[in-house]
A protein has these predicted regions:
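A short secondary-structure junction signal
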Residues: 91-96
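Conserved catalytic core of two-metal-ion nucleotidyltransferases
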Residues: 25-88, 108, 115-191, 196-214
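Catalytic metal-binding acidic patch
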Residues: 1-22, 174
Length: 214
């Protein structure tokens, strides 16, 4: 079941699968859901996870003061979709584009909070991420694509491809969900080697949600 103090569930996939996923959603997503991403709506902020799949007729306000939802047709409950891409194992190759996006990030936040939509900066930001993935295509290292800048560029989330693929399926509630092939190795990088250590009791509470209406 859900961990009470980590009150959300995420999806992650490689960019090559993400492109096919968008096509599938356009064709097959049930009417009671919608999806939001920069690829289909230039109001979407690419600093947040690559996509949100939302349920219509619901409402959720996040703990997030700087990155408001500009796709105002739906503020429903959602699942985040994170985009992964191929990465370089070399710091020399890895850092330039990663640092460039780190520098662009605060300007996107600034203009967004001034009520302006910096589409040029967003396109530049996203294209840097796509270029980086293309340059490293086929690498045995993968990780969050370069649009995820809320991590030190000196210690990015980078995983061994073989620690994630092929995925394995495990029971969760009443279904089977895919997880990393080597979950321990994945979680040591994505969370911390101490991921099995309980947080202090005062921190064992939901952290993502301000208000929710179902």
């Amino acid at each position: 079941g859900f961990i009470p103090w980590d009150d959300d569930a995420d999806i992650a996939m490689l960019y090559e699968d993400y492109k096919r996923f968008i096509v599938a959603l356009k064709q097959d997503l049930p009417q009671e859901y919608t999806f939001q991403c920069f690829d289909t709506d230039k109001r979407y902020n690419p600093l947040i996870p690559g996509m949100k799949i939302r349920k219509k007729g619901t409402y959720l306000k996040e703990v997030n003061t700087l990155l408001a939802n500009r796709c105002t047709e739906c503020d429903g409950i959602f699942i985040d979709v994170f985009v992964y891409d191929y990465c370089s194992a070399s710091k020399t190759m890895d850092l330039p584009l990663r640092m460039l996006n780190q520098l662009i990030m605060p300007f996107i936040i600034l203009f967004d909070n001034l009520g302006m939509n910096p589409v040029f900066l967003k396109r530049w930001f996203v294209s840097n991420a796509r270029m980086y993935g293309k340059l490293n295509e086929g690498s045995k290292k993968i990780g969050f694509d370069l649009t995820w800048t809320f991590k030190s560029p000196l210690k990015p989330f980078i995983f061994d491809y073989d620690d994630i693929y092929p995925v394995q399926y495990v029971p969760f509630e009443d279904t089977q969900l895919p997880i990393a092939h080597h979950p321990h190795e994945y979680l040591c990088t994505a969370i911390a080697p101490s991921y099995m250590t309980l947080p202090p009791e005062e921190e064992q509470k939901p952290k993502h949600i301000v208000d929710i209406r179902l």
